[in-house]
C-alpha cells in the first residue's frame, strides 16, 4: 500500500456535514485495509483567492496508507460531491504522523491566550 496526503475544502455552508464526510471517507479507507496516520480538521479558514464567489472554506487534512483503488474511488467521490470545492491527493514516500505546522502554530498560541 502507498502513502497519501489528502486535503479537501468543503463549502462553508456545509460545515456541519464535515464530520459525517470524514467518517465516510475514513470508513472506506479502513474497510479496504488502509490506515489513517493523521487526521486534522483545520476548520473554516480564509481562502487565498475566491472560489465560486466564496472567501472561506472548511479544510480537512488526512495522511493515509491505502490501496490505489480506494484512493481513486475517493477522488471520484470528491469530484461528484458538490460540497467539496477543491481537493488534492498527493503520494508521499513515508507515513506522516506528526502534527502539521498549522496545528503546531495553533497549539503555541493557545497557552498564551
Curated annotation (Swiss-Prot):
What GO terms are given for molecular function?
A: small ribosomal subunit rRNA binding; structural constituent of ribosome
Q: Which GO terms describe its cellular component?
A: cytosolic small ribosomal subunit
The record's annotation in Gene3D superfamilies points to: 3.30.70.60
Q: Which CDD domains match?
A: bS6
What are the record keywords, sorted? Answer: Ribonucleoprotein, Ribosomal protein, RNA-binding, rRNA-binding
Presence of the UniProt keyword Cytoplasm in the record: no
Q: Name the chain's protein.
A: Small ribosomal subunit protein bS6
Q: Which organism is it from?
A: Pseudoalteromonas translucida (strain TAC 125)
Q: Which gene encodes it?
A: rpsF
Amino acid at each position: 500500500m502507498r502513502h497519501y496526503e489528502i486535503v479537501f475544502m468543503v463549502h462553508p455552508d456545509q460545515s456541519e456535514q464535515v464530520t459525517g464526510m470524514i467518517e465516510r471517507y475514513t470508513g472506506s479507507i479502513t474497510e479496504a485495509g488502509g490506515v489513517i496516520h493523521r487526521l486534522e480538521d483545520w476548520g473554516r479558514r480564509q481562502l487565498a483567492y475566491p472560489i465560486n464567489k466564496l472567501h472561506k472554506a472548511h479544510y480537512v487534512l488526512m495522511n493515509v496508507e491505502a490501496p490505489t483503488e480506494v484512493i481513486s474511488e475517493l477522488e471520484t467521490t470528491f469530484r461528484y460531491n458538490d460540497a467539496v470545492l477543491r481537493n488534492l491527493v498527493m503520494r508521499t514516500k513515508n507515513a506522516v504522523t506528526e502534527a502539521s505546522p498549522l496545528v503546531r502554530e495553533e497549539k503555541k498560541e493557545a497557552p498564551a491566550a
